[in-house]
Regions:
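Cytosolic covalent-transfer regions centered on His/Cys nucleophiles
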Residues: 1-150
Length: 150
């Protein structure tokens, strides 16, 4: 997780805008090259067209693999109002875990997705992340969860 790119209150109110804002936060943290931003956003939106990454219980995990990504990375965003992300349970999404991986890292990408899904199954963790006081509070919660690198 790129700590500098965590968004404690995302401004976006719809799916494509959430994805865009999260990728921009990685660009602003100098983890994604400006020239690659639009291609990454397109790849994430294309992935969403295959099936929503809104997995339910207020969580979405937009993810993609792309040639321009050299190292697996991710960030987190939170919405206090909730966003319609076409989640599988039809409920709004409050927590977004974005994952970007190099094209040649299928195993690591799947392992990271598995780790994220394991962690967010915990209803207490989801509640704590939604209620955390700012970025520092969110980071502290992640650090307490075994295996999350911030």
């Amino acid at each position: 997780v790129v700590e500098e790119a965590i968004i404690t209150e995302i401004k976006a109110t719809e799916k494509a805008a959430v994805i865009r804002e999260m990728v921009y936060s990685l660009r602003d943290s100098q983890k994604v090259n400006s020239k690659d931003v639009e291609n990454i956003i397109k790849a994430l939106i294309k992935r969403e067209e295959l099936g929503s990454t809104g997995i339910g219980k207020g969580v979405a995990v937009p993810h993609t693999k792309h040639d321009c990504i050299k190292k697996i990375m991710g960030t987190i965003a939170r919405s206090t109002k909730g966003v319609d992300f076409n989640a599988l349970d039809g409920e709004p999404v409050y927590l977004f875990f974005l994952l970007l991986s190099p094209n040649d890292s299928a195993g690591a990408h799947l392992a990271a997705l598995e780790r994220i899904s394991t962690v967010i199954r915990d209803s207490d963790l989801r509640r704590f992340m939604r209620e955390a006081s700012g970025k520092d509070g969110m980071v502290e919660i992640l650090r307490e969860v075994d295996g999350i690198q911030v």
